[in-house]
Amino acid sequence: MRKKIIAGNWKMNLTLAEAKEITKGLLSACDSSSYEIMVFPSALHLESVASIARDSQLIVGAQNAYQSGLTAMTGEISPVQLAELGIQTVLVGHSERRQFLGETSEFDNTKISYFLKHGLRVVYCVGETWAEREKGNTFSVLEDQIGKGLKGITSDLFKNLVIAYEPVWAIGTGKVATPVEAEEAHAFIRKEIGKLFVGADLVAENIQILYGGSVKPDNIKELLAKPNIDGGLVGGASQKLDLFLGLLK
């Protein structure tokens, strides 16, 4: 049975004091929650947040890393440096990095492959824009992102892979896919993963697929009631402790 995940992506938000406060407030919730709880702080806050979360059930992940060991790559973070902080989970493919930094699914594939082969857990984000959805291209976009992003990933590596479906038009807009629309996309993603290689149907059945896009305490239960939705990758509602705790009830 797939365990539900609630993951908070803090992006470039929160002061250090705010990040620490939320982290401390989540520790006791982790002990009693049936969910797997993750937070993805700003790179500058990783060390402090990871220190607070050490020896707890709270998983601290990085919003980005580079697909290499220690090397000359200005402005990037190596998984080796993350490991020193006890961080073994990384986001890949978020729509903001695709849209504003020009990252492609092919580029994401190099990250995913490197990270998984070096023992990291990856949360791979996929999703369509509003223009793509209006043209009826949601499924073709998802097929392309899954096919290119996960190309060559072998079955043994999927145990450390999580998918997050984030329709770009619902991120930070207040819009949200209906539970039926979200379930439809999640079911399609699961089907596409099942077509990646011989025997991938079992991998597809076991992989956790999260929904992201204006997830809040008042809509999360209905979303998680759908059979193919295994949790949420949450932005705004994860940046206030009371709302984050509300997601876990």
Swiss-Prot record:
Involved in the gluconeogenesis. Catalyzes stereospecifically the conversion of dihydroxyacetone phosphate (DHAP) to D-glyceraldehyde-3-phosphate (G3P). Substrate binds at N9, W10, K11, G172, S214, G235, G236. It is an enzyme of class 5 (isomerase). It catalyses: D-glyceraldehyde 3-phosphate = dihydroxyacetone phosphate. The active site is at H94 (electrophile), E166 (proton acceptor). The gene is tpiA. GO terms for biological process: gluconeogenesis; glyceraldehyde-3-phosphate biosynthetic process; glycerol catabolic process; glycolytic process. Homodimer. One of its GO terms (cellular component) is cytosol. GO terms for molecular function: triose-phosphate isomerase activity. SUPFAM superfamilies: Triosephosphate isomerase (TIM). Its EC number is 5.3.1.1. It is found in: Cytoplasm. It comes from the Bacteria. Pathway: Carbohydrate biosynthesis; gluconeogenesis; Carbohydrate degradation; glycolysis; D-glyceraldehyde 3-phosphate from glycerone phosphate: step 1/1. PANTHER family: TRIOSEPHOSPHATE ISOMERASE (PTHR21139:SF42). This is Triosephosphate isomerase. InterPro entries: Aldolase_TIM, TIM_sf, TrioseP_Isoase_bac/euk, Triosephosphate_isomerase, Triosephosphate_isomerase_AS. Keywords: Cytoplasm, Gluconeogenesis, Glycolysis, Isomerase. Its main location: cytoplasm. Belongs to the triosephosphate isomerase family.
